[in-house]
From Swiss-Prot:
Possible component of hydrogenase 4. The chain crosses the membrane at residues 4-24, 34-54, 75-95, 122-142, 168-188, 217-237, 256-276, 286-306, 322-342, 384-404, 417-437, 457-477. The keyword Flavoprotein does not apply. This is Hydrogenase-4 component F. Keywords: Cell inner membrane, Cell membrane, Membrane, Oxidoreductase, Transmembrane, Transmembrane helix. One of its GO terms (molecular function) is oxidoreductase activity. The gene is hyfF. It is a multi-pass membrane protein. It is found in: Cell inner membrane.
Amino acid sequence: MSYSVMFALLLLTPLLFSLLCFACRKRRLSATRTVTVLHSLGITLLLILALWVVQTAADAGEIFAAGLWLHIDGLGGLFLAILGVIGFLTGIYSIGYMRHEVAHGELSPVTLCDYYGFFHLFLFTMLLVVTSNNLIVMWAAIEATTLSSAFLVGIYGQRSSLEAAWKYIIICTVGVAFGLFGTVLVYANAASVMPQAEMAIFWSEVLKQSSLLDPTLMLLAFVFLLIGFGTKTGLFPMHAWLPDAHSEAPSPVSALLSAVLLNCALLVLIRYYIIICQAIGSDFPNRLLLIFGMLSVAVAAFFILVQRDIKRLLAYSSVENMGLVAVELGIGGPLGIFAALLHILNHSLAKTLLFCGSGNVLLKYGTRDLNVVCGMLKIMPFTAVLFGGGALALAGMPPFNIFLSEFMTITAGLARNHLLIIVLLLLLLTLVLAGLVRMAARVLMAKPPQAVNRGDLGWLTTSPMVILLVMMLAMGTHIPQPVIRILAGASTIVLSGTHDLPAQRSTWHDFLPSGTASVSEKHSER
């Protein structure tokens, strides 16, 4: 099968199911059942197709389709795998969550059709970001993710959710406009120096000629790009949309926003980071990333300590973790880059679990207020264990996966003489740990309210959490070889732009859990 057919199936599947879900609005009597079946089929096909494309790209190194317009390499493969897995799990969770909302009159069957329609449309726009090799299409796809997900944020039609949706649209549209300025600067400069100016629209072609780009223009372009796509990533001080959107959206949408959408913007930023490092060196980009990253971690850490809304707390944790990824990229080097990519994966798993858990809390307690949400171990013990495990993982406790990427970060920072940054980072991560542990202790063990019915929710709202917790434990103790292969391929691409590739073999694979280093070493020898 040709790559063009493969990409067409991948991109058109969520778009087709989006249209079918919207069409179910006309089947008023059987809309709920029909749209649920369509949704289930759509997310299953998406998972299969995404993993198929990732496997194909890993075997081939990189693949192109539609000329040079569509492209998946090792870096894109990592983000596509995350999108496919998280899209599937949040899709499964959505079935149980939305069934409860419809049964209790929070949503009508017609609105449920709208929800699933926009859910698949949102997946399509994020797929377009990940697979696009065209700089302008990449930017347009980022903008499209805002529009498609804004409807999901405001799906309940309440004043607070509509305000959050409009705030999200306005801030991200203004922010991403800066990204367009940076994109135009890169394109215009590339078109003036490349033998074929029309090829300057393609990222892979610009990368080949990036050493010819004007350093002054690229320095300015990176400032615009960091502000623009950093807004969508949730970096401070452009993060103001994120807490409101995450807290007001339905919980499965909150999980998608945090675990996939932020990654999409980060992927675009990393792709430009590679080009800019080739053009002007890594010192200036790394310095900016360290500044924005540390500010994001610092501000988020203090907000995590004082939050009393469980979903807003998790939203600020997303700001903190995106800041930490920026710090890891800013530290640089083979270990720092690998830690950043590993942390992106780890954060996606942990945050999806916790937003699903917070959704179960909201369904059971009817509130997100941490002064009311207490005694989960007595109210719904199975969910409580899963939620507690997710909270410990997000806090960076062993043997969970985030401990490994944070340990790599500390080691990379010390190895590259960033002692002050590492000391400050450790202090801030201690504050985050305190905030998350305090939240978990209160939610799990405080005296439960008498009016709340006891008993866990259905398997549709707990099975995704089980899968995620198992994956996090596996990633913290013995990372599967296919995952190592994807991470190694992604880190190789980023390192090729920072000129640190020759040192790769002797650094990051030594920090992996026992039994997983061998495959990474084989990959680095290719």
